[in-house]
A protein has these predicted regions:
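Conserved structural core of kinase catalytic domains
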Residues: 2-66
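Generic structural motif
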Residues: 2-5, 44-46, 73, 98, ...
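Conserved NTP-handling cores and scaffolds of large molecular machines
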Residues: 19, 78, 133-136
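Broad hydrophobic/π-residue packing in well-ordered secondary structure
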Residues: 38, 43, 66, 76, ...
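Residue(s) on the long, well-ordered alpha-helices that form the structural core
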Residues: 67-71
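Protein kinase catalytic-loop region centered on the HRD/HxD motif
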Residues: 72-84
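C-lobe/activation-segment region of protein kinase-like
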Residues: 83-85, 90-154
């Protein structure tokens, strides 16, 4: 829930004019209660990628599928660049046993920076994608430059 009046106003404006999250199948709606704006999303059990990625993504092909899934999830979430950066927090990215990527929406609006350039958002998405792709190589090689060809190209 968002208590800060300025932040609440800006998010409400985005909901109404930019249709923030409306293309997101997980977005249920929003409401105001006791001067707080509440955004309601479908909840997924927390299977954090940061904790379970190495367990569920055993082969490079699994990592590649999950990386593409993260790109698709970012494209489909309807968040835009400034909210999208908030979604990329490790607490929000889940991985299923099948390698599907899902978001939880624990958005920390104290970290929200309206007007973030899309380029920065794309760079952060790319960093997360590379983090998924390198799951099976990190720790086995001294530097990313020494990764084998299949990941080295990325």
């Amino acid at each position: 829930s968002i208590a800060d009046p300025d932040c609440r106003r800006k998010v409400t404006e985005k909901l109404n004019t930019e249709r923030l999250f409306f293309s997101n199948r997980d977005f249920i709606g929003s409401f105001i209660y006791e001067k707080r704006l509440n955004l309601v999303f479908r909840y997924y059990h927390e299977n954090l990628l940061s904790l379970l990625g190495g367990v569920y993504l055993v082969e490079f092909a699994d990592c590649k599928r999950a990386a593409l899934g993260l790109i698709a999830a970012c494209a489909e979430c309807g968040a835009g660049a400034d909210m999208g950066v908030l979604l990329l927090n490790d607490r929000n990215i889940n991985i299923t046993r099948e390698g599907e990527v899902q978001f939880n929406y624990f958005l920390d609006f104290s970290q929200w920076q309206p007007g973030i350039e899309e380029q920065r958002y794309y760079q952060e998405v790319a960093q997360k994608v590379f983090g998924i792709l390198e799951l099976n190589y990190k720790g086995k090689y001294e530097t990313p430059d020494s990764y084998p060809g299949e990941i080295g190209r990325f």
